[in-house]
A protein has these predicted regions:
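PRPP-associated nucleotide enzymes
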Residues: 1-196
Length: 196
């Protein structure tokens, strides 16, 4: 598995491009819904870039760890505000399997949203749902700025289960662009947390 570790600045630039695509398409969402948890940060930025919309959330649980997903996502929190009759932009950070996007989209449609369009920063070619708007197609495992420590925690767990040295995982993350000092810091913090 190849990791890609985009910076905050790269993500912001990608969101600027996405906002331009949405504006050029003449789609004006009245509500932007971020899928918990990865969709929250980009949904908030998109609210700022597009303006004139309300921000809401929906919670879908899918991944247990890195590349370790349940078969089907579960809606754990319905949309937080009424969407009936509204144009809705549903946002997530990545369309990987596409199942969580599909589940959330179906949920919003069942709540009688007028139009539901989907947007993600990254799109993977095997996703069962191609977002209406996305910025980059990739096959890599994306490590977003808002989930780096969580990713390292999962990597440590996976390395232990598979008998792989943690050093190997560290090198793969560094090769993907994560700062080595940050990797070491998080590993040390996690190991201290485990010791109590």
């Amino acid at each position: 598995m190849t990791f890609e570790v985009p910076t905050w600045d790269k993500i912001y630039g990608m969101l600027l491009n996405l906002a331009e695509k949405i504006t050029d398409d003449k789609f004006k969402p009245e509500i932007i819904v971020g899928i918990s948890r990865g969709g929250w940060p980009p949904a908030r930025v998109m609210l700022d870039l597009l303006g004139n919309a309300k921000l809401a959330n929906v919670s879908v649980e899918f991944y247990k760890g890195i590349a370790d997903a349940t078969d089907e996502p579960i809606l754990t929190q319905p949309v937080s505000i009424p969407v009936e009759g509204c144009n809705v932009l549903l946002f997530d950070d990545v369309a990987d399997t596409g199942k969580s996007l599909r589940l959330a989209k179906n949920h919003l449609e069942s709540k009688r949203a007028r139009t539901v369009k989907t947007a993600t920063i990254y799109y993977k070619p095997w996703s069962i749902l191609k977002p209406d708007y996305y910025e980059e197609k990739t096959r890599n495992w994306i490590v977003f700025p808002w989930e780096r420590k969580e990713t390292i925690r999962c990597l440590i767990e996976n390395c232990r289960k598979e008998g792989i040295p943690i050093e190997k995982a560290k090198n793969r993350l560094a090769d993907g662009g994560m700062d080595k000092h940050l990797i070491d810091r998080f590993i040390n913090e996690i190991l201290k947390e485990e010791q109590g």
